[in-house]
């Protein structure tokens, strides 16, 4: 077995999006080849309604899929296909923009004014860029939860993990997307397929991710880290990008640690990206925006 060393550790950056929503961007809108097939991860977390209530009014997408995971509050959604709904705490929304969709996402806080969720963008391969758009909502009760002997808790959103399969299926990037909670002081090794790009995003507590590629470098609980490279310490709003290997090891801190662990098979295709539209060439991108101006952007009619 080969432990994935940490390739990069960065803090999510404050960003304004939509009509003035304050959020933190873990990665996106730059060179995202190390994250391929993923393009962007936003952490929208706030307890001040004035910082998020303006939301994300009607806007287009083409060429991507989005996975929205809500932990507190709700996100009211509507789109050009006629879909309407609300993503509540613990729920997932998966949207395939495909050939084109126009939608809005309007966050609402819980009774204490808190709003928290994540949105992950996954690229579509060139063969599926112009597929019909589609949409799915998954309720919290449908998401399998695994609790290990040491108290580690895993919610399986997408893909197969520890024998459980998440309810969000059919995403072209074939992601494995899990929400991991490790109790204080515990060390955990988690499998990740070698062929996948993988990252973790810490949003509660803190921990140390093993930064060695040799199995002998795995620490022994209560003894310390034996690797020559020090472990990467990650706390709230830290993104950890991993290098090659087939497993990762994390030591939870005194308050435990909770993080998203996401992996996917790289597409290795050219990316032409501007705002909410992601294609393969600049000409395709130009055409998409021209169609927006001409009113011919939507290729699929709304359901009656």
Regions found by a protein language model. Give the residues of each.
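Jelly-roll (double-stranded beta-helix
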Residues: 1-304
């Amino acid at each position: 077995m080969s432990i994935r060393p940490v390739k990069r550790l960065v803090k999510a950056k404050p960003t304004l999006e939509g009509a003035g929503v304050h959020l933190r961007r873990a990665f996106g809108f730059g060179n995202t080849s190390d994250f391929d097939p993923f393009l962007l991860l936003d952490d929208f977390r706030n307890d001040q309604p004035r910082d998020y209530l303006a939301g994300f009014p009607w806007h287009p997408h083409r060429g991507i899929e989005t996975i929205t995971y809500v932990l507190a509050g709700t996100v009211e959604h509507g789109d050009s296909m006629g879909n309407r709904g609300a993503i509540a705490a613990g729920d997932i929304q998966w949207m395939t923009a495909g050939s084109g969709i126009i939608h809005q996402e309007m966050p609402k806080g819980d009774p204490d004014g808190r709003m928290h969720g994540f949105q992950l963008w996954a690229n579509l391969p060139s063969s599926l860029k112009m597929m019909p758009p589609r949409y799915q909502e998954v309720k919290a009760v449908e998401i399998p939860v695994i609790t290990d002997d040491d108290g580690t808790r895993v919610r399986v959103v997408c893909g197969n993990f520890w024998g459980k399969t998440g309810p969000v299926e059919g995403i072209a990037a074939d992601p494995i997307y899990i929400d991991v909670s490790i109790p204080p002081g515990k060390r955990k090794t988690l499998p990740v397929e070698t062929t996948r790009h993988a990252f973790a995003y810490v949003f509660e507590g803190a921990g140390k991710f093993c930064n060695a590629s040799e199995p002998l470098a795995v620490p022994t609980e209560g003894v310390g880290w034996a690797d020559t490279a020090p472990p990467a310490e990650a706390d709230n709003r830290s993104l950890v990008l991993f290098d090659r290997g087939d497993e990762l090891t994390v030591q939870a801190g005194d308050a435990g640690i909770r993080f998203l662990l996401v992996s996917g098979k790289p597409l290795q295709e050219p990316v032409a990206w501007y705002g909410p539209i992601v294609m393969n060439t600049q000409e395709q991108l130009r055409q998409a925006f021209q169609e927006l101006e001409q009113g011919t952007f939507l290729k699929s009619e709304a359901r009656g």
